[in-house]
């Protein structure tokens, strides 16, 4: 399968997987126009859409795409039923698309019904995990997001993390504000800064590398614990995650 990213709006990415026959899977099409342009340019035949959550910048293009290609099956969580979903899926279930099984993983936090899709090596994680960061807590709690990130972090090392937004540079600036002397974070920040200066995409990222540079996945890391302890004593990694998320919200 081939992985493609389609830029949308200011910083969204719509991911498309296609096979050798030209059949394709579209993930979180917030805008139909760039997707339709890519379909025409590549002569793709859309087979399915995956929705991770109900926010408009992830579902806004569904109606137009389905009108154009009525054979499309739209998979999504319960919260997307009124956004065009035709096949509701939940945690532990699978979606069989393009000859591959995609596992559905419940990841509440950004929204209560947020889900991710995984078929090795591809992880479509919507607004749960970003490179260097994680989604804001619009509906869920810090505890829920912490558990959700733990689920994703436990996936295989070679997982390709396909995030839905180009937030990497700002996330790495935040990471540097927390751990300014961390070698991995500094190296990755320089790499990301160079890519963005050329207007190049920073995604997807390899999960093994992401665990090293994403402070939200390092809540049991002694360097991070020492930084937090300078301000407040927090015993549980879940509490340290909440501290980080609160800091990021104000960054």
From Swiss-Prot:
Pfam families: HAGH_C, Lactamase_B
Keyword annotations of the record: Hydrolase, Metal-binding, Zinc
Species of provenance: Escherichia coli (strain 55989 / EAEC)
Phylogenetic classification of the source organism: Bacteria, Pseudomonadati, Pseudomonadota, Gammaproteobacteria, Enterobacterales
Known function: Thiolesterase that catalyzes the hydrolysis of S-D-lactoyl-glutathione to form glutathione and D-lactic acid.
UniProt xrefs under SUPFAM superfamilies: Metallo-hydrolase/oxidoreductase
This protein's pathway: Secondary metabolite metabolism; methylglyoxal degradation; (R)-lactate from methylglyoxal: step 2/2
Protein name as catalogued: Hydroxyacylglutathione hydrolase
Family: Belongs to the metallo-beta-lactamase superfamily. Glyoxalase II family.
EC numbers on record: 3.1.2.6
